[in-house]
């Protein structure tokens, strides 16, 4: 059990989509392509030894001061995060469960400042998204895909406010 909690702690500041550098609505091919690229960059067996030597020399004084020589551990940690993210997002069921978890975390993290009816939001057909102005001058944006996945809490892109979008599934 300790191992699984360690895995979740590794990725605690970034979600799996951020780790794989894809959007939350990315398709499996896009996710796979990004995973492969990142795996090649961070896999411990694929790392360029000369780059590691040069990096270790550059970080030598920091290691002495901090008594912390975990450069390789950082690369291994990055690769492990990438692997965990891929294993979750490549499986449809695990991805849906993970997306639900992200949504629940988002709801708990952000207190809802207002409830807005979807009909009051402007629909931007080009991006298939709904937009609503925030009092800070920026906007709340939610896509049709997010709505169909059950997402209803939207954070402003410019401040810490969030709204709950009221709508009925058709």
Curated annotation (Swiss-Prot):
Leader sequence segment: none
CDD domains hit by this protein: DnaJ
Keywords of the record: Iron, Metal-binding, Zinc
Database matches in Pfam families: DnaJ, Zn_ribbon_CSL
InterPro entries: DnaJ_domain, DnaJ_domain_CS, DPH_MB_dom, DPH_MB_sf, J_dom_sf
SUPFAM superfamilies, per database record: Chaperone J-domain, CSL zinc finger
PROSITE patterns: DNAJ_1, DNAJ_2, DPH_MB
Annotated DPH-type MB domain residues: 112-168
GO molecular function: metal ion binding
Domain J: 15-102
Residue numbers binding Zn(2+): 134, 136, 156, 159
A biological process term (GO) from this entry: protein histidyl modification to diphthamide
Family note: Belongs to the DPH4 family.
The record's note on its domains: The DPH-type metal-binding (MB) domain can bind either zinc or iron ions.
Described function: Stimulates the ATPase activity of several Hsp70-type chaperones. Plays a role in the diphthamide biosynthesis, a post-translational modification of histidine which occurs in translation elongation factor 2.
PANTHER family: DNAJ HOMOLOG SUBFAMILY C MEMBER 24
Protein's name in the database: DPH4 homolog
């Amino acid at each position: 059990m300790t191992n699984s909690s360690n895995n979740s702690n590794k990725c605690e500041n970034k979600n799996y989509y951020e780790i794989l550098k894809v959007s939350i609505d990315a398709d499996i091919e896009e996710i796979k392509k990004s995973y492969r690229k990142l795996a090649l960059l961070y896999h411990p067996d694929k790392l360029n030894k000369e780059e590691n030597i040069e990096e270790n020399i550059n970080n030598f004084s920091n290691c002495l001061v901090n008594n912390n020589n975990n450069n390789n551990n950082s690369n291994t940690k990055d690769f492990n995060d990438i692997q965990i993210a891929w294993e979750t997002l490549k499986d449809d069921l695990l991805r849906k469960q993970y997306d639900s978890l992200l949504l629940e975390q988002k709801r708990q993290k952000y207190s809802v400042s207002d409830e807005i009816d979807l009909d009051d939001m402007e629909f931007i057909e080009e991006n298939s998204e709904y937009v609503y102005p925030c009092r800070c001058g920026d906007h709340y944006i939610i896509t049709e895909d997010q709505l169909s996945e059950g997402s209803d809490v939207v954070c402003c892109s410019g401040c810490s406010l969030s709204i709950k979008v009221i709508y009925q599934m058709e």
